[in-house]
Amino acid sequence: MENLAELPSPWFVYLVRCANNALYCGITTDVSRRFAQHQKGRGAKALRGKGPLELVWSLPVADGKSAALKLEYRIKALSKSQKEALVAGMARIDQLEIIFQ
């Protein structure tokens, strides 16, 4: 049995809604910690002064940081309406895979 301390931290891709209704996409190993950083102005520079912020979507990524970075890149390439469909639960990442090919 593996030692739990040796297991890698799971990665997450997340979307934050800004006051101007824009969606920011990022990755982290701890969504609540990262969102708290964004709210305090210590996260991404792109979100500073854009509050109030709302965490609207997150997804665990099983295959580590590299896979999370690739998914983040793909989500950032989606249109606003496609991102909104993810947030609303009307679309799943696997349904959008056609767009990524």
UniProtKB/Swiss-Prot annotation:
Q: Name one Pfam family in it.
A: GIY-YIG
Q: Which residues form the GIY-YIG domain?
A: 9-85
Under InterPro entries, the record lists: GIY-YIG_endonuc (IPR000305), GIY-YIG_endonuc_sf (IPR035901), UPF0213_domain (IPR050190)
User: Which domain of life, per UniProt?
Assistant: Bacteria
Q: Which PANTHER family match?
A: UPF0213 PROTEIN YHBQ (PTHR34477:SF1)
Similarity field: Belongs to the UPF0213 family.
The protein here is known as UPF0213 protein VC_A0739
Organism of origin: Vibrio cholerae serotype O1 (strain ATCC 39315 / El Tor Inaba N16961)
Taxonomic lineage of this organism? Bacteria, Pseudomonadati, Pseudomonadota, Gammaproteobacteria, Vibrionales
